[in-house]
């Protein structure tokens, strides 16, 4: 199994990153993608990936929350990071109209700029969309023929939104959100609709600790070593064998990111 979304640059991991990676290996996680969400964190993510070249890779991008920070200097930084074989995708980029930490037009501008950069560099894109589906698809769609591949990370949308994303050829990233009986019920019902060769799994650690985990870690911090729990839950919802699902989703990740 492969974790496509780990926020390993988070200060929550500052004291024990090596142990976090060790626990993930021991849990059977075969690799992980470290997410970059702004220029600085993208540099930090690549630095961490280089310390574990057989196990960790990174993305480089500007999350919609940080879209107001986008500049020519940011683009130059991401282009430089892309020279490393450990940096395998542009993102996390997209739109988030849930909280609008950057205004929608700033978000759209930064999203377009990163799609252009991904097309220029022939890299996949690692996408974010929350409460912005129609605008998200309208911006993304013209770029798709020019992009190597695209994954919508941490999908939490509706059935029509899922069908729209699949129709456009997107890969779908699923997190422990499906383990939340309060928020994840609709998402749980959508699991059988995702083609096996388009499904990717992720923890989004340290966020989104699976709500149904027992026992819960005292820290309430999510970790990549909990990915097997998500695998089990997704397999159950799809009627799949957990081992086969773990292998298939890991293969999907390695193909998508050319690992």
From Swiss-Prot:
3'-5' exonuclease that prefers single-stranded DNA and RNA. May play a role in the H(2)O(2)-induced DNA damage repair. Gene3D superfamilies: Metal-dependent hydrolases. Disulfide bonds: none annotated. CDD domains: TatD_DNAse (cd01310). One of its GO terms (molecular function) is magnesium ion binding. Its main location: cytoplasm. Monomer. Its cofactor is Mg(2+). Belongs to the metallo-dependent hydrolases superfamily. TatD-type hydrolase family. TatD subfamily. A divalent metal cation binds at residues 92, 128, 153. Its EC number is 3.1.11.-, 3.1.13.-. GO terms for cellular component: cytoplasm. It is found in: Cytoplasm. This is 3'-5' ssDNA/RNA exonuclease TatD. It comes from Erwinia tasmaniensis (strain DSM 17950 / CFBP 7177 / CIP 109463 / NCPPB 4357 / Et1/99). The keyword tRNA-binding does not apply. InterPro entries: DNase_TatD-rel_CS, Exonuc_TatD, Metal_Hydrolase, TatD-like, TatD-type_Hydrolase. The keyword Cytoplasm applies. Keywords: Cytoplasm, Exonuclease, Hydrolase, Magnesium, Metal-binding, Nuclease.
């Amino acid at each position: 199994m492969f974790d496509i979304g780990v926020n390993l640059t988070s200060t929550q991991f500052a004291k024990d990153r090596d142990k976090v990676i060790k626990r993930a290996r021991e849990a059977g996680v075969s690799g992980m993608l470290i997410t970059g969400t702004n220029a600085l964190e993208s540099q930090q993510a690549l630095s961490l990936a280089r310390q574990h070249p057989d196990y960790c890779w990174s993305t480089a991008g500007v999350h919609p929350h940080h879209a107001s920070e986008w500049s020519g200097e940011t683009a130059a930084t991401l282009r430089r990071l892309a020279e490393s074989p450990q940096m395998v995708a542009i993102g996390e980029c997209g739109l988030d109209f849930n909280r609008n930490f950057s205004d929608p037009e700033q978000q759209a501008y930064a999203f377009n700029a990163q799609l252009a950069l991904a097309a220029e560099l022939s890299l996949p894109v690692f996408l974010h969309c929350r409460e912005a589906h129609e605008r998200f698809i309208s911006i993304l769609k013209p770029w798709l023929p020019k992009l190597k591949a695209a994954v919508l990370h941490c999908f939490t949308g509706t059935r029509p939104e899922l069908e729209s994303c699949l129709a456009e050829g997107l890969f779908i990233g699923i997190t422990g959100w499906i383990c939340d009986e309060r928020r994840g019920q609709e998402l749980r019902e959508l699991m059988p609709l995702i083609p096996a060769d388009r499904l990717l799994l992720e923890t989004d650690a340290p966020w989104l600790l699976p709500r149904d985990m027992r026992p819960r870690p005292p820290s309430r911090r999510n970790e990549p070593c909990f990915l097997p729990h998500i695998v089990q839950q997704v397999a159950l919802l799809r009627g799949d064998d957990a081992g086969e699902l773990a292998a298939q989703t890991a293969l999907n990740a390695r193909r998508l990111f050319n690992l």
